[in-house]
């Protein structure tokens, strides 16, 4: 069987697809981007958040391409299980696929026993492989974002990422990804630290916001690359912080036995996260604190009670970016995403007042299915251009 997975987490899915794969299952990460929004809007309403239109467009275009045997193909989509509209994508995707003239299973990846009969089977072996994929991809993303803007030989960072992706996918597929994670962390950091860099002084921008827009280049019109080409270094926090936020905010309301299991899982994940952070810092790279001190640091500055969608994690990442010296933060969200408008927009002015001594500037960038790339870049320039001007003047950035 072939399982099609939509673009969502650029770095994470490159490794996570090895966790889903088996001898009988081939996993294909959809990367088609041309015309996907228009194709998606044929089958979903434009009032829906744009990640849904992109996912539907990717799937329909892939099925129309003829590259996949529709008799032996399925589509996999994650569900958070809260009141975010993303939890309702699956019935919309099924309806769209049927309307497009195809009949393939649409599977759900969730931890709430939703979609019984069409739920991806989550096993302990899969979880261990997935943990390895998440931690390695976080490490590679953090390293790449801190080195690529300064590399002396263009393309060297991306090439090293491809080399490590290939090695790590093989380890994860075999189930040995976590066995040698300590030595792998060291080898990866050492390899990236050896890349020759310039000594330029560049502005530093943080990305926060809704999961899809923050991590998916198709969703955010390759905004990270655009910023790098304009002379900025972009910092994006790792996905493992979201995983721990999700456990902390969504999975503690079960029976005592299940809750205890999730707490153990949380401690294991954060233990690996701490080791990754120590290794990064040992080789001179920067990273947020592990989840527990990361959360503790922000509790006096933002409310940590809103847990729908990306919830309080958005504000927490803004605060941590500001406290780490980042002077500009781009807040990315789909237009009409209520959880992000409440937890994001609703906190921006308060955060800027509370952190006025840091000089951090926030700019909200909304993505809409009918919006143009030019409008997105113009909005993003409201944050970047003043920072570049100040940088040329020699002011602290």
Give the positions of each predicted feature.
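An N-terminal assembly and electron-transfer interface module characteristic of large anaerobic redox
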Residues: 1-397
